[in-house]
Amino acid sequence: MKNIKLSALNLVPIREGQEDKDAINDMVTLAQALDDLDYERYWIAEHHNAPNLVSSATSLLIQHTLEHTHSIKVGSGGIMLPNHAPLVVAEQFGTLETLFPQRVDLGLGRAPGTDMMTASALRRDQHNGVYQFPEEVEQLQQYFGPSHQQAYVRAYPAVDKNVPMYILGSSTDSAHLAARHVKGYHMFLQDILLHNK
């Protein structure tokens, strides 16, 4: 049993009778407990326009959690790439990796994590992110790559940073993309369990 590496995902829910700050405090308290139990990873989700969740500013919650834990890896489960410019994601996670070396994970999803009106408000450029997801994953890899392989636009301080990237998904397309480009693939087990019933 000691060889099994355990991880957790937190959507940062606001429980009945709680305020936003209470949910964030609970998020940190859980992370600290899991850190003490030698969990390997603690990931925080990204959701927008969800009144019962406080996980819209994922990178800020990751930083806050890293500041209050010692060794557990903290990351996104995941950053919904259609909502963000890859340059900004690389800059944010490059900064996190600079502040907390070898403790940051970058999980990426291709869904917007919200309804279409909110997704449109997040990316006003009429971005078609679901279909551009593979190219945007490649852009992220470029931004984290070695300085001698960078283009004119560079994502400082992400250059030369080794931030592990994971693809989150439930399809073979996502699995193939992960096999070609990133460290790992995470599949939501509920999809498998419901399919087998």
Predicted regions located by residue number:
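Hydrophobic faces of well-ordered beta-strands that scaffold small-molecule active sites
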Residues: L6-N10, Y42-I44, V74-G77, V104-L108, ...
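Aromatic/hydrophobic pocket-lining residues that form the small-molecule binding cavity
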Residues: A23, M27, T58, V89, ...
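N-terminal beta1-alpha1-beta2 module of alpha/beta enzyme domains
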Residues: M1-H68
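Glycine-enriched alpha-helix->loop->beta-strand junction motifs that scaffold or abut catalytic
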Residues: H68-S71, F100-Q102, A179-H186
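Active-site mouth loops of central-metabolism enzymes
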Residues: N10-N25, I79-P86, V159-G169
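Flexible, glycine-rich active-site loops centered on histidine and acidic residues
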Residues: K2-K5, L9-D20, N83-G145, Y185, ...
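A conserved active-site cap/scaffold subdomain adjacent to cofactor or substrate pockets
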Residues: D173-N196
